Amino acid sequence: MKPQNDGENVVDELAPFAYDLPQEKIAQSPIEPRSSAKLLDATGGQISDRHVIDIADLLKEGDLLVVNNTKVLPARVKLFKASGGGVELLFLEEEEAGIWKTLARPSKGLAKGTELMSSNGELAVRVIDRIESHLDAPVRVIVEVIDPSVIESQGSVPLPPYIKATLSDPSRYQTVYANRPSSAAAPTAGLHFDELVLSALSKRGIEIAQVELSVGLDTFLPIKTNKIEDHQIHTEHYEVGRETWERISAAKRVVAVGTTVVRTLETVAKTGQLEGRSSLFIHRPYEYKVVDLLMTNFHIPRSSLLLLVDAFLSEGRWREIYEHGLANDYRFLSFGDAMLLERGM
């Protein structure tokens, strides 16, 4: 995707974060069992090929593994205008009780006051505002939900746009510990965990702490500006329990499972607020304050998530890791394989 270009002499600061990702490397379905996914171990300065089931052997007693316990909503809902025309709403985030930010397709004709019905003819939502797009982002539509049951009863789980296959088992796009329905996308690093991994971690003396960050669809978008600082990072709601934060602060090493956990913990460290909205845009030369190790999937080129990973590692290290992944048949993106990284290595 071409970045925004405001002049012939503008330097594309995202060019160093571009790489060729063949379509066949993008995993279209989850692997079974979950913990059989590959795990690229880049701790200690070397690269070795392991599997997720091995992660307990790569950690130490006293490490604290932090996971995001958010649950993906069945957020894609087909509704109908009074005229009978269909509208697909993708519920992104509940901004306040009963008020949701959504994506609507098609959005044309959804003026303030427009009412949309469920498939049984009952009033489901009412449009109360529109947020016009910036760059080429879709129009956001703010709706009041009249019938809260419509999401659970008639919705389906949305998948990232690069996954074209149909998911036969929707539970495979949920972590096994998901319990807080609030997200439009899964915290994908956590998809690799199953009871085998959790049991192995427990036997090793590695405890697990849970935080929540509501994952939005903007997490999948590449950066479209030439200058890194010009990118407007998406904001997401997070929450960390006080006792959980005390455990994190006291841990010998903090192992973040996924970039959503990184954003959560580093936001709390920066702001001192255990609950709020994170607008933290992590890129070099950001100095990490909490996270010591990071387990994460392979991310799309030119994305804020790739910049986060770059800032976590020694300069240029991410490319060596990604080239190894591409050359050794690792599966990329949401349903793909994972890597374990050590800060500064």
Predicted features and spans:
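Surface-exposed, charge/polar-rich loops and edge strands
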Residues: 2-345
